């Protein structure tokens, strides 16, 4: 039987945006590689040697960000048609973007392996980027075309619904959890829903090494989530990160018509999935308690006891930088028992 979880807002939690830092490249713009002076998009975050790796949905650059200075080093990803690395409606090439939306970094055989996933919302967006050799001046980048993996995920209708749209990934031991947004349309009796599934990490790595021969891992442990509404707009997952025994997630209330087009954003929430499955969230606010209306696309769990996390806001504006936010978490985020008592 398909498992469902229902999330609820939790008044005992708070997520306060303390700092908003626009992201710029150390070296400025580079017309030769079609790179603007700023990190124009932001989809997901992971810690790598040298900083925080940030993937972008509509620009073929990996940005390695120093969170203290908000300056970034650019790592080139393969160019698209015509040698371009920026994609948007203004250029008329939005359909050609890789749409990288989720990423993880892990120690594999003594080195950091970074893996970023296309959303799978169209056939063009069925690629996986693998980056290794971080000790080199230019880490080694491989673009793996992975239609077999995405076809396998789409076959799991409870997970993918009518329109697969991967938005987050989280690694725990040998299982990779994938998060889908849930903003597509109905597929028969299957309504769109935010959902998760797991795949075997080692099987995935074997597939990425030889996708023409090795079968993709099968999705398992599908969970569908009803995250609720924010200002009347349905919430959908945008990213997730492990923090001790719990899962932190971000979700946005975006009135998009489908898994491809953008829509008006009503705001974002930070949520938690406890070890017992209890799922709750709180809207993001600024230090004055006012609603924070940015579209949070990526999250990185706190690295110490300070309880501050990083999140990236994508402005969906080709002429503006994405923004790295520092967020303070207040309340019983890691204590489900006290949280339930407070509710």
Residue ranges, per PLM feature:
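Sequence/structural signature of beta-propeller domains
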Residues: 1-343
């Amino acid at each position: 039987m398909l498992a469902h979880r229902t999330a609820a807002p939790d008044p005992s939690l708070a997520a306060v945006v303390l700092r908003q830092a626009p992201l710029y490249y150390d070296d400025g713009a580079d017309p030769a590689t079609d790179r603007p002076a700023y990190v124009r998009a932001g989809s997901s975050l992971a810690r790598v040697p040298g900083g925080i790796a940030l993937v972008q949905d509509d620009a073929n650059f990996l940005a390695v960000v120093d969170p203290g200075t908000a300056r970034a080093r650019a790592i080139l990803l393969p160019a698209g048609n015509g040698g371009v690395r920026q994609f948007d409606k203004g250029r008329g090439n939005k359909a050609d973007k890789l749409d990288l939306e989720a990423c993880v970094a892990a120690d594999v055989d003594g080195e950091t392996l970074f893996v970023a996933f296309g959303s799978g919302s169209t056939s063009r967006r069925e690629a996986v980027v693998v980056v290794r050799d971080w000790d080199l001046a230019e880490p080694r980048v491989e673009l793996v075309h992975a239609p077999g993996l995405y076809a396998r995920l789409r076959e799991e209708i409870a997970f993918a619904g009518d329109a697969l749209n991967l938005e987050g990934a989280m690694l725990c031991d040998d299982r990779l959890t994938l998060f889908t947004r849930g903003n597509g349309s109905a597929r028969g009796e299957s309504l769109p829903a935010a959902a998760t599934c797991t795949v075997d990490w080692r099987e995935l790595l074997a597939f990425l090494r030889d996708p023409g021969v090795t079968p993709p891992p099968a999705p398992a442990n599908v969970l569908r989530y009803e995250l609720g509404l924010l200002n009347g707009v349905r919430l959908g997952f945008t990213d997730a990160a492990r923090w001790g025994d719990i899962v932190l997630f971000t979700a946005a209330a975006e009135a998009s018509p489908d898994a491809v087009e953008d829509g008006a954003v009503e705001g974002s929430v930070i949520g938690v999935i406890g070890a017992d499955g209890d799922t709750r969230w709180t809207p993001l606010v600024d230090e004055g308690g006012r609603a924070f209306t940015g579209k949070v696309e990526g999250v990185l769990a706190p690295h110490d006891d300070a309880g501050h996390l990083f999140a990236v806001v994508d402005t969906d504006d080709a002429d503006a930088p994405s923004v790295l936010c520092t967020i303070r978490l207040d309340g019983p985020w890691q204590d489900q028992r006290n949280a339930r008592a407070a509710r």
